[in-house]
Amino acid sequence: MEIPIQVAVRIFPHRELKDLLRSFGPTEPKKDAQAVDEGADSKDSEAQVPAAEKDNPSISETDPNGNAEQDSAADSKTIPDANGNDSGQKDYPDSAYCVQAIPISASALGLPSALPGGDPMDSIAAGLIQVGPHTVPVTHALPSSSSQEQVYHQTVFPLITLFLEGFDASVVTYGQRGQGKSYTLYGNVQDPTLTDSTEGVVQLCVRDIFSHISLHPERTYAINVGFVEICGGDVCDLLGMGNIHCTNVDAVFHWLQVGLSARQSLPAHTLFTLTLEQQWVSKEGLLQHRLSTASFSDLCGTERCGDQPPGRPLDAGLCMLEQVISTLTDPGLMYGVNGNIPYGQTTLTTLLKDSFGGRAQTLVILCVSPLEEHLPETLGNLQFAFKVQCVRNFVIMNTYSDDNTMIVQPAEPVPESNSSAGPLSQAGPGDNFGLQFAASQWSKLVTNAEGLFSKLIDSKLITEVEKEQIEEWLFLKQECEECLSSTEAMRQQKQLVPILEAEEPEDVNSEAANSESPNSDNENDTDNESHRPDLDDKIESLMEEFRDKTDALILEKHAEYLSKHPKAVMQSQDREIEAQPPEENGDDRKVSIGSRRRSVQPGASLSTAELAMLNRVASQQPPPPIDPESVVDPLESSSGEGIRQAALAAAAATAPIEQLQKKLRKLVAEIEGKQRQLREIEETIQVKQNIIAELVKNSDTRSHAKQRFHKKRAKLEAECDKAKKQLGKALVQGRDQSEIERWTTIIGHLERRLEDLSSMKHIAGESGQKVKKLQQSVGESRKQADDLQKKLRKECKLRCQMEAELAKLRESRETGKELVKAQGSPEQQGRQLKAVQARITHLNHILREKSDNLEEQPGPEQQETLRHEIRNLRGTRDLLLEERCHLDRKLKRDKVLTQKEERKLLECDEAIEAIDAAIEFKNEMITGHRSIDTSDRIQREKGEQMLMARLNRLSTEEMRTLLYKYFTKVIDLRDSSRKLELQLVQLERERDAWEWKERVLSNAVRQARLEGERNAVLLQRQHEMKLTLMLRHMAEETSASSASYGERALAPACVAPPVQASSDFDYDHFYKGGGNPSKALIKAPKPMPTGSALDKYKDKEQRSGRNIFAKFHVLTRYASAAAAGSSGSTAEESTALIESTTTATATTTSTTTTGAVGKVKDKALVSFRPEQLKRLMPAPTATKVTRQKNKIIIQDASRRN
């Protein structure tokens, strides 16, 4: 079980000691004050606390929180501190308390208990320690006025109770130097100068342990003590003899005194261990063996350094202990070390491994100082104590069970005194552990010698005489083994000892823990088997062969049994089985009465191997089919028996119907899920085919746009080359820096436009690849749909078969019901009763004739005795039947029975069957037939014949005892089997529920995956439609452009036009007019543009670039939106992003184009004559109409989708 570590905080009584020192004489205060100041051994500093409590009654008075208060008469002027505690007298201002213990009622807070099923007072946090504004919850809050007995009974005594039951216990004292750690553990009994000594926790524990042992004289025990000291990483044995066996309290106290006297003066840790080993015989005659250890650790002072609180202790062992606690409580640190807790870094943590995170129930007693000058140290220790409470130990019982080992009670009674109780070696004649160990060692030596002799024979290095001696030795050894094995088998068959089974859950846990050693012994075997991967297959094949042969042998023996067995005996057995009222048995009692499996110990549960065997048998034996025609003949049984049999058949027929309905529901759910998936796949295929058709239909548009982009790219590349040549000329001729910058800007702009055109060309040429991918995806979807259709056809066929089978079962059940109704009618019952009476009359006549014939046979006195015994047995059987019917009626009425009544019901069943067997045997003796036992005696094996011979030699009392034991074992086995069947039914229900949930979730996941694929295909279709419209629009705008940017840029600066055309590419008529001076299209030459004019030119170029490449930015944004949608966003978010981007871009393009047209018109009216306006005026209306038309088409397509 998992139990948290408990923490008890004890406040050091500084104030009480000072009052005690003032009340002493002039010679004593020096010694005591020196002990208080030194603090090397805290037992000296607290040695006078009990005496102070006795001499000064004012000290023993406590407030409601359990804190000691000063006598009001001593000094009426006292100043309370910030926590409300009395700060003491004015003469001792340094004795002000800043630590307060606040006990809390655990039941009032509803806190959980530290022990499973324990008292609420033993809760995890039953007190608070208040240090200034800080409050720390602890398991036990002990005020400064607490005595040693109070500390022991409140904190340590529950651990000792568990220790006596076989659990490990650990008590650790922790705290600042000189605060009473050693005094809490060992008291001051080791100081001979003190007249009034006080015992510590260790002494009180030892007294309680021996007191408990004296109350159980039937147990043998052994107590060993050890005392070690850890100083600087070295372990020193204070006793000098290791673990020492002690027989009484005085011996333990003596060795404890020796160890305390041998301690060093340096700061060190001490560890006192007490081991208790117990053995006794249980009521069933089985050996109980338990071993538990109690450790008492006195750690040295913390003496923290560094940033306080908390700081870190100076001692390396304590520092590593705090690191271990942090690792156990912090999952991050535990993950960092991969679960390898650093216990082995220091000697202290290695020895305390079981105490912190191990298998012992641990109590940490923290001794703190209440003074303000020790406040940082106190806070650091309290933080460590709070972490310790979060650590949980896995406490288990240390029990050892010896199977098939009977312990004989010693003839001499064990005295109740402590001194007379001896060690385990004095356990009596039943203790043969030493003999067993010697026998095992002898066997190992013989085995080793045999191997050595075999090697010598093979080596051919010995003479013939030596070889003959070795062979003779091997022959004698083989004969000895055969004799021992036969004797051991005979001894085990004679004793018929029960099998040991664990009765308590704690024993189960302890056996699981103690099974580590045998598992470690078998590691070599496991390693050898791991090198043979085919071993499991061979074992499985052999098991199958064994099952087949066993089934064939059983069928053969059954047929032989039926052929040899008399028919009358078979009919009598059938009548006996039918005589028991089956309708009064509950649903949970459908267990075969005649079934026999191997017996187990009385009162014990089934082991794991037995559970596995029963599960396998249950899975391999399906319920027999119910034949509606197999109705009990009314002439062979009474009418009531026929009705009961028909009712039983109808109840048995209900079980397969329910199972079949359950399978049918699962199958229908699978079929519905696959049908939905098939519809989704078909819809996805249709959408993909639509996309392919649209891509094929718009392939001409894409190819036309691709050609346009290619031509435009060629023009831009030529213009870029020209611009680079002009830039080179300008650099060679050393022209003005502004001109060089202008050409550099032009080249950069052309390169960017070339990159954009390459991207658009690539987008326009992707239609072929997309068609291929879509066609491949359609093929995969069709293949998936075909697979689903095949599975659907199979499942539909299986559903039809199951429905037909279910209809047959329902018909058989209806037939059974009609049979019950027909037999339940009064007329039918009357006819059956007459037929039965006629049958009974006929049988009585036959029985009388048989009786007359039997009376003529010899031995009438013996036959009469047997008949008298049979009549007595029948009377007993009637009484048992009456009691069983009473229990069945109570079960039917109350729906539940007590454990005792359930066991009584099973005992009645078994007793009735046993009486029937005895009656049958006696009838066979009367009639002169040979029993089955005698007829098959010759065919028995030799070992079985020997067993029967030994059983025949048993006396009547021994045979009665043996039969009673096996009768009890059979009852226990039937009870365990019934419980196992109930557990199996519950597990099957849970399994069915989880299978149904798993099926529903898997169908939902597959459905969601298919829906997501269909949504992605729909989005792709929308994207392709919009992309086609964009490419068509851009191709039209590109074809409407008549000139390029490079021709305008390459024109001389002196003839640059002062105005711009209505579109970005309508500059051809300007440059053409520049070559004919007769046309008045060009104004007077202007000087080179200045920096401000060049900036305006750049701004204008940037605005003009938005007109043609806005659609390309739409495509780029859509690509990014589609990537984001595929990585985690939903389809709706991607669609919204595309539509918003398209709308915004269209609006921006319209605004830019309209503004440019207006400006061009205004400037053209100023610069040109009216006859030239018609030739220079562009056609913006067509472009605008095309754009509006495309926008309407996109919106209509979005609404249709």
Curated annotation (Swiss-Prot):
Effect of a null allele: RNAi-mediated knockdown results in the increased expression of reactive oxygen species (ROS) in the gut of 7 day old conventionally reared adult flies. No increased ROS expression in germ-free adults and in response to bacteria-derived uracil.
Any Pfam family hit: Kinesin
Biased composition regions of type Basic and acidic residues, renumbered to the chain: 28-56
Biased composition (Low complexity): 510-521
Region of interest (Disordered), ranges: 23-92, 502-536, 565-606, 618-639
Annotated positions of the Phosphoserine modification: 599, 605
Extent of Polar residues compositional bias: 57-75
InterPro entries (UniProt xref): Kinesin-like_fam, Kinesin_motor_dom, Kinesin_motor_dom_sf, P-loop_NTPase
Ranges in coiled-coil conformation: 652-821, 968-1001
Record-listed ATP binding positions: 175-182
GO biological process, one term: intraciliary transport
UniProt keyword Nucleotide-binding, yes or no: yes
Gene Ontology cellular-component annotations: cilium; cytoplasm; cytosol; Hedgehog signaling complex; kinesin complex; microtubule; microtubule associated complex
GO molecular function terms noted in the UniProt entry: ATP binding; ATP hydrolysis activity; cytoskeletal motor activity; microtubule binding; microtubule motor activity; molecular sequestering activity; protein kinase binding; RNA polymerase II-specific DNA-binding transcription factor binding
Family, per entry: Belongs to the TRAFAC class myosin-kinesin ATPase superfamily. Kinesin family. KIF27 subfamily.
Subunit architecture: Homodimer (Potential). Binds microtubules. Interacts with ci, smo, sgg, CkIalpha and protein kinase A catalytic subunit. Interacts (via kinesin motor domain) with Ubr3.
Protein name according to UniProt: Kinesin-like protein costa
Organism: Drosophila melanogaster
